[in-house]
Amino acid sequence: MIGKLNGKIDSHCDDYVIIDVNGVGYLVYASGKTLAKLVEGKFYKLFIETHVREEHIHLYGFLTLEEKNFFNLLQSVNGIGTKMALSILSNLTPTDIQIAINNDDRNIFKAISGVGAKLAERIMLELKDKITKIFSSSAIIKDSNISSIAINEVMKALVNLGFTRFEAQNTVQGIITQNPKISIDELIKTALKNRNSSF
């Protein structure tokens, strides 16, 4: 499975790019917003989601882990596949999606080609609880390299290790405020170290 590609954009098409990695060209599909940022001849790091089927292997590329995570999150909704997930991400950023669901704004989804009233309703119903948890973490990650979904997973891990939800959120927020560029592994280690030192 391919998780990341570092290379030069060799060619640019309507819904994909060819990225040259050490002489090997990989065809990578991406959202319109991501494609608009990729310039032929320049080097980029793309986070990759690999879909393996009997008849094909498709690679989907993202400039941020947050967009990749939302690509997978959207596909958890009944009726949304890879093409529709990319279409939504071509029109809306992850933050746009969070805000729309938090504000119960179906119209922003219905304005996207292929998303009718029924699918917009399913997006609201099936992602509401997930997005609410993610949205509560968004303030924590304002100046951080870590995505909101990853922050939520860190807090769940800390709760499983004995933190209350309140303790986990306050601890994570305090650590990221002091070190916005901290990695997920170091974030968890620091949180546990801080908790142990307080006893």
From Swiss-Prot:
Known role: The RuvA-RuvB-RuvC complex processes Holliday junction (HJ) DNA during genetic recombination and DNA repair, while the RuvA-RuvB complex plays an important role in the rescue of blocked DNA replication forks via replication fork reversal (RFR). RuvA specifically binds to HJ cruciform DNA, conferring on it an open structure. The RuvB hexamer acts as an ATP-dependent pump, pulling dsDNA into and through the RuvAB complex. HJ branch migration allows RuvC to scan DNA until it finds its consensus sequence, where it cleaves and resolves the cruciform DNA.
GO cellular component: cytoplasm; Holliday junction helicase complex; Holliday junction resolvase complex
High-level lineage: Bacteria, Pseudomonadati, Pseudomonadota, Alphaproteobacteria, Rickettsiales
GO biological process: DNA recombination; DNA repair
Domain-related comment: Has three domains with a flexible linker between the domains II and III and assumes an 'L' shape. Domain III is highly mobile and contacts RuvB.
Protein name in UniProt: Holliday junction branch migration complex subunit RuvA
Matches recorded under SUPFAM superfamilies: DNA helicase RuvA subunit, C-terminal domain, Nucleic acid-binding proteins, RuvA domain 2-like
UniProt-annotated location(s): Cytoplasm
A Pfam family: HHH_5
Organism, scientific name: Rickettsia prowazekii (strain Madrid E)
Annotated stretches, region: Domain I: 1-63
Entry keyword annotation includes Cytoplasm: yes
Keywords annotated in UniProt: Cytoplasm, DNA damage, DNA recombination, DNA repair, DNA-binding
Chain residue ranges for the region called Domain II: 64-141
